[in-house]
Amino acid sequence: MVIWTDPAKADLHHIFEYITHDSHHYAKKVVQEIADKTGVLHELPHIGRPVPEIGDDSVRELSLYTYRIIYEISGRDIYILAVAHKRRDLKAQDITR
């Protein structure tokens, strides 16, 4: 099962709020595409690449537009940990696991 953590939900909300300043339609589209992209993870959990800043193969990422969708594989569950802009200087301590 794919489970969105509270920090990841907050990231998605902030992305929506930021984009909506320019286009409400595009903001909805981007957020929906991010959600859709995570939908395949329950069947293909290893589709993403390991996150180099974390150094743990169970923490992986998918890329969409300018965003990194960071998730952790834990048994049969997939936890969406964060959705971060690619330009962000991401550090291991920025990801709540």
Task: Give the label of every model feature segment.
Residues M1-V31:
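Arg/Lys-rich, positively charged N-terminal/basic patches that mediate binding to nucleic acids
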Residues H24, G39, E43-H46, Y67, ...:
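Generic structural signal for secondary-structure transition and capping sites
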Residues L64, E72-R97:
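Enriched for short, Lys/Arg-rich terminal
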Residues I15-Y18, K37-L41:
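Short alpha-helical functional segments enriched in proximate histidine and acidic residues
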Residues T38-S63:
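A short, surface-exposed loop/turn module that caps and links secondary-structure elements
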